[in-house]
């Protein structure tokens, strides 16, 4: 299996599905001739033609609306929103049309579309290029939401998303495109070629949606994470010496609640980490699930480590970003409770 950066794993998944299924089409701002701002579609237009990989105007509502119509008529569109921060003009088409089409038509029509969005901070993108809006999508019935943490998962989950008959939001942490970033911004970037999950098989494979992965087994505390925070949590556990069990959710909807429950019942403690703002973040839903299912097994209050309730600051990016120091402090608190 060749080592592969995460953006190239995304490209490999798109390449595989374009080759296997003539109904797959890929489009968005700069995804055609230019190959995407993060190179995730590099060379695909030259290989498959302008009718299957093409550029669009800067009109997110139009991009998503076109995808809904394509899906209803049998295609499998994979539109890209250049940054997750730009999706807001397209939310009406996404929430009112794509998410509800199956329900509204009695399943006569579906919207088998996968909307790719680079998300998250850590690249000095400021408030308009750093947001993590996953909780917007998990609140809407009819959408599935995925956020991979490594190249191997990115390819397998994206293939599964494209094959799904319902709309999937595929969030790609852009700080992970080049390597497994653990929050230590003052250290040299590690390449995916030095990480076991940077090895990506050639050809077709899929990872079913709704299955979490245990990245680190442990008995002291459960850490629920996804995306970039998987690597931050691993660093925090290593630096504190706490025997943490790290659960990479991978898919936020459908959510692997059985894996969450099994781990928390075992450890009796739970820390939840995400990069998005704290209030009404997805961590609040995870906390509710843990309290409902594992209340009598808990030996300490559930902790959340998140971004702050502010727009993503440019100059104070690393004060906002939940790094291993903040995560490690939360791990110590639940162990001392």
Predicted feature residues:
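Thiamine diphosphate
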Residues: 1-167, 171-178, ...
């Amino acid at each position: 299996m060749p080592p592969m950066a995460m953006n190239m794993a995304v490209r490999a998944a798109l390449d595989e599905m374009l080759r296997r299924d003539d109904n797959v089409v890929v489009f968005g701002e700069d995804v055609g001739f230019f190959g995407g701002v993060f190179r995730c579609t590099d060379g695909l237009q030259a290989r498959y033609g302008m009718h299957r990989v093409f550029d669009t105007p800067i009109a997110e509502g139009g991009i998503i609306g076109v995808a809904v119509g394509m899906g209803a008529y049998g295609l499998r569109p994979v539109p890209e929103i250049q940054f997750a921060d730009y999706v807001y003009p397209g939310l009406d088409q996404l929430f009112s049309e794509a998410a509800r089409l199956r329900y509204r038509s009695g399943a006569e029509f579906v919207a088998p579309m996968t909307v790719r969005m680079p998300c998250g901070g850590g690249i000095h993108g400021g408030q308009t290029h750093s947001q993590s809006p996953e909780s917007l999508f998990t609140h809407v019935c009819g959408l599935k939401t995925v956020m991979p943490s490594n190249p191997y998962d990115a390819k397998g989950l994206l293939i599964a998303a494209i094959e799904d008959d319902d709309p999937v939001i595929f969030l790609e942490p852009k700080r992970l495109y080049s390597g497994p970033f653990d929050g230590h911004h003052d250290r040299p970037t590690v390449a995916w070629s030095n990480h076991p999950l940077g090895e990506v098989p050639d050809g077709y494979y899929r990872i079913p949606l709704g299955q979490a992965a245990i990245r680190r087994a442990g008995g002291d505390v459960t850490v629920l994470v996804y995306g970039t925070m998987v690597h931050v949590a691993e660093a925090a556990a290593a630096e504190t010496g706490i025997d943490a069990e790290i659960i990479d959710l991978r898919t936020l909807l459908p959510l692997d609640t059985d894996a969450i429950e099994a781990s928390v019942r075992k450890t009796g403690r739970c820390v939840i980490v995400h990069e998005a703002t704290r209030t009404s973040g997805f961590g609040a839903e995870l906390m509710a699930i843990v309290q409902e299912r594992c209340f009598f097994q808990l030996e300490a209050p559930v902790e959340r480590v998140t971004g702050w309730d502010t727009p993503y600051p440019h100059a104070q990016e690393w004060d906002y970003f939940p790094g291993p120091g903040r995560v490690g402090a939360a791990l110590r608190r639940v162990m001392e409770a």
